[in-house]
Each structure stands twice: as C-alpha cells, then as structure tokens.
C-alpha cells in the first residue's frame, strides 16, 4: 500500500477564479503532454483525481491559482 492511497483531500466549495489561473494550468499541461499522459495512464487514481479537479475548475468561481505548485508536483 502506498502512502498516497491513504491521502484524502477535501476542498471547500468554489469561490472565484481569474483567467490567468486557467492559463497557468493549460500551460503546465501543454508543456510536456506525452510525459504527463504516460504518468497519468500509469497511475489511474491520479488520472481520476485530475479529471475531477478539471471538471470542478471549469467553475470560474473556483480560485485554484494557489494549487499551481501542487499540480506541478503531482504531475512530475
């Protein structure tokens, strides 16, 4: 059992978002798509978490700029 299987994140309801934070995430994902794709397909739980996060972040009220470093850490 890996440590991240016990890891649980509970996010507060969405609050707000700027257009710049969406651009930051898009840039991270576009920089090295093949590497990120390989990482995520090899780790289905991370893929599901990212899919859920991206679905939530489409709500423009969600401030996720503070999560940029965490997204970068998880994807590398």
UniProtKB/Swiss-Prot annotation:
Subunit and partners: Interacts with sulfhydryl oxidase OPG072; this interaction involves formation of a transient disulfide-bonded intermediate, allowing disulfide bond transfer. Interacts with OPG088; this interaction involves formation of a transient disulfide-bonded intermediate, allowing disulfide bond transfer.
Family: Belongs to the orthopoxvirus OPG128 family.
Domain of life: Viruses
Annotated source species: Vaccinia virus (strain Copenhagen) (VACV)
Disulfide bonds: 17-21
Keywords: Disulfide bond, Late protein, Redox-active center
Induction remarks: Expressed in the late phase of the viral replicative cycle.
Function: Late protein which probably participates in disulfide bond formation by functioning as a thiol-disulfide transfer protein between membrane-associated OPG072 and OPG08. The complete pathway for formation of disulfide bonds in intracellular virion membrane proteins sequentially involves oxidation of OPG072, OPG128 and OPG08.
InterPro entries per UniProt: Poxvirus_A2.5L
Gene that specifies this protein: OPG128
Pfam family, any one: Pox_A3L
Protein name in UniProt: Protein OPG128
Keyword Disulfide bond: yes
